[in-house]
């Protein structure tokens, strides 16, 4: 039983929004997971789909795995660094804008 993983770090996406999509495909077969992501209208779905496709390609190339038997073993989204920016407000003030990033980890296996 081999497991292969793919990682995407520093994605410009909120952790909560990424976890919503990750919960949809956890434990599913990879073809079913790709189908779910194809029809999920979220920015996170496009990002996670690319990471899942990378994990599938890694499993096929590095381990010689059969794609039809692969399942999404683990998928999790962790918080990354937050970019802090300022925007101008009235009367010479400024407000902070947080631009969160996250890291996406996908593991596929039999």
From Swiss-Prot:
Source taxon at top rank: Bacteria
Pfam families linked: Ribosomal_L22
Family: Belongs to the universal ribosomal protein uL22 family.
InterPro entries hit by this protein: Ribosomal_uL22 (IPR001063), Ribosomal_uL22_bac/chlpt-type (IPR005727), Ribosomal_uL22_bac/org-type (IPR047867), Ribosomal_uL22_CS (IPR018260), Ribosomal_uL22_sf (IPR036394)
GO cellular component, one term: cytosolic large ribosomal subunit
PANTHER family per the UniProt record, alphabetical: CHLOROPLAST 50S RIBOSOMAL PROTEIN L22-RELATED, LARGE RIBOSOMAL SUBUNIT PROTEIN UL22M
GO molecular function: rRNA binding; structural constituent of ribosome
Keyword Nuclease: no
Biological role: This protein binds specifically to 23S rRNA; its binding is stimulated by other ribosomal proteins, e.g. L4, L17, and L20. It is important during the early stages of 50S assembly. It makes multiple contacts with different domains of the 23S rRNA in the assembled 50S subunit and ribosome.
HAMAP family membership: Ribosomal_uL22_B
Species whose genome carries this gene: Variovorax paradoxus (strain S110)
UniProt KW Cytoplasm keyword: no
GO biological process, alphabetically ordered: translation
Subunit note: Part of the 50S ribosomal subunit.
Annotated protein name in UniProt: Large ribosomal subunit protein uL22
